[in-house]
């Protein structure tokens, strides 16, 4: 889930001209080079062989009876059928089998471990740095890591189903609810009872942003129903949390090869950002590498060639418990931010590329809401509906971002006046869709990484991206 920067906020070198199109770039590849390897961001067939399912079990030849010990009776002896191997439990489609049933030992797959770039000086820390580091010691805790890896595996299995099953003609509501129902089923937590949503669930509303809508669109009650078209480019952005620690990962789907290079540019830029991220790395260095990779691509649409531009006023971000945007931002363009990444931090490394202007504005409607983490536990308000709604938010979402669909799923009614009161008093922040110019197309790829002591773990990495 991208973090929008304040309007007109300076990002240092953000006004520098985009780098020219070229065959190679830092972390980049020539235009179109990815597609012989990466495909279009969707999962391939590669399921491997199915020998383990027991279907190919061979029968051992029967051993003849020893004539000396064979019984003298002529009665026929019933042959025992060979036992079939128990087939491994596989995820259903749509995904509904709790992950704990698929992993009975409750040990979940590790993310991709990347070594830090050589030459980084990771030992010279100030006292303040050491204090912050010790406050993040949980990142090496086995229970924390296993829970976080479980959330990542839930994300992988649900997005695999999404990539295999979502097709033009489906409504965005149908797609969003399929993703969200899958997440809840795999976590074995419907989230309907008070407090359940704080234990595990969706990290934020499922984003399904089409074409020039770059980010932060989710279908909500009262909106016009949108049907996915074969010409659409759809960003799919959803989060899975356990105990408030959110795995934030996103990908882009298209059904027309016209947009392959757009997807390739953004996927390359995201992987370049991951490669350059690390302990004690300056954010400005990561941003510069992202922009250089992204803007080395162009895309041909209807006979016109468009450079792929890095979006300038939305960023990657660090993640803290129950906070999807925790304060540090990673722009996708050159800047003068000398803030460093630190050991023990968690980052959502994401990039957005567009054929449009690369500057976003608020679109119509509402994506979701999020309680200000610094807001008080209880409020005083002359509006009873505002107080009861605020209590409902605290009990079910805390500071997690949520949407109207989630409120109505909990049975909350007549909440708009109370919500407007909470927003106007600064207790709750409202998020709107973010748009580029009409007629443009945009893409997004995103992973969550943990800056551990010995490596950076790309916890959401999968075979797909």
Swiss-Prot record:
GO molecular function, one term: metalloaminopeptidase activity
Record: residues binding a divalent metal cation 1: 237, 248, 446
Enzyme Commission number(s): 3.4.11.18
The organism's place on the tree of life at top rank: Eukaryota
Localisation: Cytoplasm
SUPFAM superfamilies (alphabetical): Creatinase/aminopeptidase, Winged helix' DNA-binding domain
CC cofactor note: Binds 2 divalent metal cations per subunit. Has a high-affinity and a low affinity metal-binding site. The true nature of the physiological cofactor is under debate. The enzyme is active with cobalt, zinc, manganese or divalent iron ions. Most likely, methionine aminopeptidases function as mononuclear Fe(2+)-metalloproteases under physiological conditions, and the catalytically relevant metal-binding site has been assigned to the histidine-containing high-affinity site.
Family (UniProt): Belongs to the peptidase M24A family. Methionine aminopeptidase eukaryotic type 2 subfamily.
Protein name as catalogued: Methionine aminopeptidase 2-1
Provenance organism: Penicillium rubens (strain ATCC 28089 / DSM 1075 / NRRL 1951 / Wisconsin 54-1255)
């Amino acid at each position: 889930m991208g973090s929008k920067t304040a309007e007109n906020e300076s990002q240092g070198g953000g006004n520098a001209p985009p780098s020219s199109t070229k065959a190679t770039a830092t972390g980049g590849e020539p235009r179109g080079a990815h597609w012989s390897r990466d495909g279009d961001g969707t999962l391939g067939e590669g399921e491997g062989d199915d020998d383990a399912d027991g279907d190919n079990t061979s029968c051992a030849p029967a051993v003849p009876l020893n004539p000396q010990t064979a019984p003298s009776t002529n009665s026929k002896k019933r042959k025992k059928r060979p036992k079939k191997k128990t087939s491994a439990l596989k995820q259903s489609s749509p995904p509904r089998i709790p992950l704990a049933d698929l992993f009975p030992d409750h040990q979940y797959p590790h993310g991709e471990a990347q070594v830090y770039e050589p030459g980084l000086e990771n030992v010279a820390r100030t006292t303040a740095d050491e204090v912050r580091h010790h406050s993040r010691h949980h990142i090496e805790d086995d229970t924390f890591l296993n829970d976080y890896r479980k959330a990542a595996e839930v994300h992988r299995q649900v997005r695999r189903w999404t990539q295999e099953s979502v097709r033009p003609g489906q409504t965005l509501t149908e797609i969003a609810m399929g993703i969200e129902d899958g997440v809840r089923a795999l976590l074995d937590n419907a989230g309907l009872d008070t407090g359940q949503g704080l234990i595990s669930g969706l990290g934020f509303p499922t984003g399904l942003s089409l074409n020039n809508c770059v980010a932060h669109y989710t279908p909500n009650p009262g909106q016009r129903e949108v049907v996915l078209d074969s010409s659409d480019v759809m960003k799919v952005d959803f989060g899975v949390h356990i105990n408030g620690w959110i795995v934030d990962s996103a990908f882009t789907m298209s059904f027309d090869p016209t947009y392959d290079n757009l997807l390739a540019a953004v996927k390359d830029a995201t992987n370049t950002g991951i490669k350059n991220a690390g302990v004690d790395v300056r954010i400005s260095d990561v941003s510069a590498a992202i922009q250089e990779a992204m803007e080395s691509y162009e895309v041909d649409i209807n006979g016109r060639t468009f450079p792929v531009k890095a979006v300038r006023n939305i960023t990657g971000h660090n993640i803290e418990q129950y906070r999807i945007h925790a304060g540090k931002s990673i722009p996708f363009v050159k800047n003068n931010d000398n803030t460093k990444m630190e050991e023990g931090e968690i980052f959502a490394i994401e990039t957005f590329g567009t054929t449009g202007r690369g500057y976003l504005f608020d679109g119509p409607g509402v994506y979701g809401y999020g309680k200000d983490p610094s807001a008080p536990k209880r409020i005083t308000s002359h509006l009873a509906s505002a107080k009861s709604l605020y209590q409902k938010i605290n009990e079910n979402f805390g500071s997690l971002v949520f949407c109207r669909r989630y409120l109505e799923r909990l049975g909350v009614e007549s909440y708009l006046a109370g919500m407007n009161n909470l927003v106007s008093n600064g207790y709750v922040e409202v998020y709107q869709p973010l748009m580029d110019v009409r007629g443009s197309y945009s893409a997004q790829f995103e992973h969550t990484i943990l800056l551990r002591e010995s490596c950076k773990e790309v916890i959401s990495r999968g075979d797909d991206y």
